[in-house]
Structures are given as structure tokens and as C-alpha cells.
């Protein structure tokens, strides 16, 4: 059985996330998805959606066989437990595949590292773009204590 690992924050799920996971699943039989812990996300603003809810959403996606939260201190610990054949990277993940491959070898892991291409030029295939769109279209009405009716948002 060929095991694939995909990783990410998966905040504000969008079609780009789904594309990444669908393409990852095509590379093997079993797809494991490691969802970043809230406190480990340092390369961008903290997630909007709490880690347990992001995990629940990712686990519900059709291509995903197993979803788990990442380790809080060692990002390689779940990889060592899963022992995947392939680790996929999203097109915008800041890992250098060659550097990751060397780090895996140092831990006696021989997974192939594959970068998945982008979903294309879609307007809302980025969590950052979704947040920007909400601010642009709803910003003035998003004040605490005002317009709490979901129909107004």
C-alpha cells in the first residue's frame, strides 16, 4: 500500500485546498493529512479557525483517509510514525523539496517529495484572498456587537 502525506494549515477551506488533496491522493492508496497546530503556524497570521475544527473539516473531505494534528515540538514525529512513500507540498508551501529530502534522510526516512501545482488563477483559492474579500465586502458592518444576525454577514 502506497502512503501519501499532505500537510498544511487548511484555514478557511477553499477549492485550492481540495485540489491539493485530490492531486495528492492520486499518487497513492492512502492519504494522511497532517493539519498544522495553531501555535506552530508562524509563517503567516495565526489561523482564524481553531485547529480542532480545521482537523474536523479536513477529515470530512473525500480524498482524506486519515487526518491528524501535527506535533507541537517536532514536525517530523508524525512522519516517522506514518512512514510515507510520498510527501506532497502545496504550490505555495515554503519548503525546499531538496532540503526536506535531506532532513528526511537524516531521520532514516526515504519518502519522495512532490510539489503539487497550483489550482489555477481562481479569485478565492487563497485563505488570504478570502479574508481580504470579507473585509472589502463586509468590513464596515463587522463590528463587535453589531449585525450579529448571520443573514447580515
Swiss-Prot record:
Q: In which pathway does it act?
A: Cofactor biosynthesis; FAD biosynthesis; FAD from FMN: step 1/1
The EC designation for this entry is 2.7.7.2
Enzymatic class: transferase
Q: Which InterPro entries match?
A: Archaeal_FAD_synthase, Cyt_trans-like, FAD_synth_RibL, Rossmann-like_a/b/a_fold
GO BP annotations of the record are: FAD biosynthetic process; FMN metabolic process
Pfam families per the UniProt record, alphabetical = CTP_transf_like
Q: Which Gene3D superfamilies match?
A: HUPs (3.40.50.620)
Keyword Nucleotide-binding on this protein? yes
Q: Which reaction does it catalyse?
A: FMN + ATP + H(+) = FAD + diphosphate
Subunit composition and interactions: Homodimer.
Q: What does this protein do?
A: Catalyzes the transfer of the AMP portion of ATP to flavin mononucleotide (FMN) to produce flavin adenine dinucleotide (FAD) coenzyme.
Q: What is this protein called?
A: FAD synthase
Recorded source organism is Methanosphaerula palustris (strain ATCC BAA-1556 / DSM 19958 / E1-9c)
Provide the organism lineage as a comma list: Archaea, Methanobacteriati, Methanobacteriota, Stenosarchaea group, Methanomicrobia
Amino acid at each position: 500500500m502506497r502512503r501519501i502525506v499532505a500537510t498544511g494549515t487548511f484555514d478557511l477551506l477553499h477549492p485550492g485546498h481540495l485540489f491539493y488533496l485530490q492531486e495528492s491522493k492520486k499518487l497513492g492508496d492512502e492519504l494522511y493529512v497532517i493539519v498544522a497546530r495553531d501555535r506552530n503556524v508562524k509563517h503567516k497570521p495565526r489561523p482564524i479557525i481553531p485547529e480542532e475544527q480545521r482537523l474536523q473539516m479536513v477529515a470530512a473531505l473525500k480524498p482524506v483517509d486519515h487526518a491528524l494534528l501535527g506535533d507541537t515540538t517536532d514536525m517530523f514525529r508524525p512522519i516517522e510514525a506514518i512512514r510515507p512513500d510520498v510527501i506532497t507540498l502545496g504550490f505555495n508551501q515554503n519548503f525546499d523539496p531538496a532540503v526536506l529530502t535531506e532532513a528526511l534522510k537524516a531521520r532514516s526516512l526515504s519518502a519522495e517529495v512532490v510539489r503539487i501545482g497550483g489550482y489555477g488563477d481562481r479569485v478565492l483559492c487563497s485563505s488570504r484572498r478570502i479574508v481580504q474579500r470579507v473585509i472589502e465586502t463586509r468590513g464596515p458592518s463587522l463590528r463587535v456587537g453589531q449585525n450579529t444576525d448571520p443573514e447580515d454577514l
